[in-house]
């Protein structure tokens, strides 16, 4: 009679009581790469929107070494006195993640949030046109310096907005049941609506 190893016995016991499986999960490999958020989930991102802010993109990237990124595309409108500022921004938040069986947990690397200003309108006009009018006659160097100053100030405002709206979530470790099937990543958390993401195709890929 073939002698059972301790591992075999343990696996058998786990299977009998329904606590586990000896088949190794492939999630840690399947999850690698870039994922694009399903548009329908963008309306239900409680901690990324609200007020005058709207989320138009919500993507993930998982690298080797338990590091990754969450990329958020967001528009927001700010009003101060007689000026209205419309911003379209990209927010990149690095994450540290862990895969365990069919589960995924992650936390934000809150000190490494990056903000890029993609578009800025002041009272409906491109901010560079507004700056050019204000520094007219002062030369190209003055114009570039003023544009850089405005951009940096806007980044600071957006970073403050991000930390204000998701400050508490940045401190939390999130856990999800995760699965990858047919190039679709699904994240489930209790009774909440599942989040679904499609694997990002390489730029050179073409449809068959």
Regions found by a protein language model. Name each.
Residues 33, 37-45, 51-55:
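Start-of-domain marker
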Residues 1-9:
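Bacterial N-terminal signal peptides that target proteins for export
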Residues 92-166, 170:
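Low-complexity, serine/threonine/proline-enriched polar segments
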Residues 22-36:
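N-terminal helix-cap/turn-to-beta initiation motif at the start of protein domains
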Residues 95, 101-103, 161-208:
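Edge beta-strand at a domain terminus
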Residues 47-122:
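N-terminal glycine/threonine-rich, aromatic-flanked beta-hairpin/loop signature
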Residues 8-18:
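Bacterial N-terminal signal peptides
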Residues 18-20, 37, 68, 73:
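Small side chains
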